[in-house]
């Protein structure tokens, strides 16, 4: 990379763009803003299926554990705030690591259209819908299952995503 200071992570391993770094965040804002504008996109999905904790801890000295996380999260929220400022009315879908980032500050800015990666279990979907509906009037789930019970368990949610592989010739389209 041209800017190794922008990245968190050990050499030779996976990296994480450090949104706590002002220049890295400015680059990402400009890049995503350009894509949104040029392509006429009005719904932004942030899918973030990594656990950032080890990246953050690895960047901190023993006596400063948590400082990189603090700066990163502050920068992450500033990133979204700037996208929303540049694109008023744009929806952000927070599909983040199985719903691990459904915190108050995130939910002030975004909606969880896919609240969790745990979508294969009907009872699990029912429990998620029941528990989350007390706090969030609008959230989503999906399923990749085809049974009637599975489908109805997922469809009780305000926003439903069908997670089927439409290339699969064995899908029963009459049933769907």
Each model region followed by its residue ranges:
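Aromatic- and acidic-residue-enriched segments that line the glycan-binding/catalytic groove
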Residues: 1-11, 59, 63, 106-116
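A cross-family glycoside hydrolase active-site/sugar-binding cleft signature
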Residues: 1, 45-47, 93-95
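Alpha-helix capping and helix-loop boundary segments enriched in small/acidic/polar residues
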Residues: 15-19, 23, 63-74
């Amino acid at each position: 990379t041209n800017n190794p200071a922008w990245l968190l992570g050990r050499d030779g391993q996976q990296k994480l763009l450090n949104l706590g770094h002002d220049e890295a965040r400015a680059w990402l804002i400009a890049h995503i803003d350009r894509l949104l504008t040029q392509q006429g996109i009005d719904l932004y999905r942030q899918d973030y299926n990594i656990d950032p904790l080890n990246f953050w801890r690895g960047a901190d000295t023993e006596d400063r554990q948590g400082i990189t996380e603090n700066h990163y999260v502050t920068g992450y929220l500033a990133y979204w705030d700037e996208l929303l400022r540049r694109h008023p009315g744009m929806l952000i879908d927070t599909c983040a690591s199985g719903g691990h980032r459904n915190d108050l500050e995130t939910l002030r800015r975004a909606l969880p259209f896919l609240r969790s990666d745990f979508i294969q279990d009907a009872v699990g979907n029912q429990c998620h819908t029941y528990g989350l509906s007390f706090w969030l009037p609008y959230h989503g789930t999906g399923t990749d299952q085809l049974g009637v019970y599975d489908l109805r368990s997922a469809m009780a949610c305000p926003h439903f995503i069908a997670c089927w592989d439409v290339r699969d010739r064995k899908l029963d389209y009459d049933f769907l």
